[in-house]
Amino acid sequence: MKNFSKRMTTLLSKVEERSYSPIEAIKLVKENANAKFDETIEAHIRLGIDPKYTDQQLRTTVALPSGTGQKIRIAVVTRGEKVNEATKAGADLAGEEDLVDSINKGEMNFDLLISTPDMMPKVAKLGRVLGPRGLMPNPKAGTVTTDLEGAIKEFKAGKLEFRADKAGIVHVRFGKASFSEEALLENLKTLQTTIEKNKPSGAKGKFWRSFFITSTMGPSVEVDINELQDLQKEK
């Protein structure tokens, strides 16, 4: 049996073992996010997929309407004039083979890596260090592109890349405790719609298994997925 702190025990006592409507769940998570910093709000969604099969893998991006409230560091591997273009567009790091060499040595002071197509043969060799961290650029995720300015601005504004892990669970941050309930709800609705639109072709049986949201230091609250889907139909 887990030993919880007095604070967590108090917070857990406020959460019933049932699913809540989306807005109820958001209100409860915000109420429980009472740490001395602006806690991140996250979604943890179990899907009815087995990612060991290629037709049951999920990897995509979502542009959250209210952003994430989190600053991310972006690195760009490119060459020539595009290095300056990336820097001017807001990249925190930009370089050619020198940046590839730094990454290969384990120097990864960034949250997202973007590459132009011509540099992917070199970046692909970094699979050993990038793969386990989920940082390998991918065309489907918009991180392999010639439009560096557009990609950098989108990701800085709150566009997120996410994937289902080996257990078929998606982990996505979708805001901060300081966000309004309405902003968090819009982000959550957008996330659910994005996953639905990118449902793997090989998914069988019940697709939505469980849907929980939580704050950095708070307990998880289950969201009623049927009610969340109904909100989309009301649009």
From Swiss-Prot:
UniProt-listed CDD domains: Ribosomal_L1 (cd00403)
GO molecular function: rRNA binding; structural constituent of ribosome; tRNA binding
Keywords: Repressor, Ribonucleoprotein, Ribosomal protein, RNA-binding, rRNA-binding, Translation regulation, tRNA-binding
Matching Pfam families: Ribosomal_L1
Assembly mode: Part of the 50S ribosomal subunit.
Family: Belongs to the universal ribosomal protein uL1 family.
Functional description taken from the UniProt entry: Binds directly to 23S rRNA. The L1 stalk is quite mobile in the ribosome, and is involved in E site tRNA release. Protein L1 is also a translational repressor protein, it controls the translation of the L11 operon by binding to its mRNA.
Record's protein name: Large ribosomal subunit protein uL1
Record organism: Prochlorococcus marinus (strain NATL2A)
Organism phylogeny: Bacteria, Bacillati, Cyanobacteriota, Cyanophyceae, Synechococcales
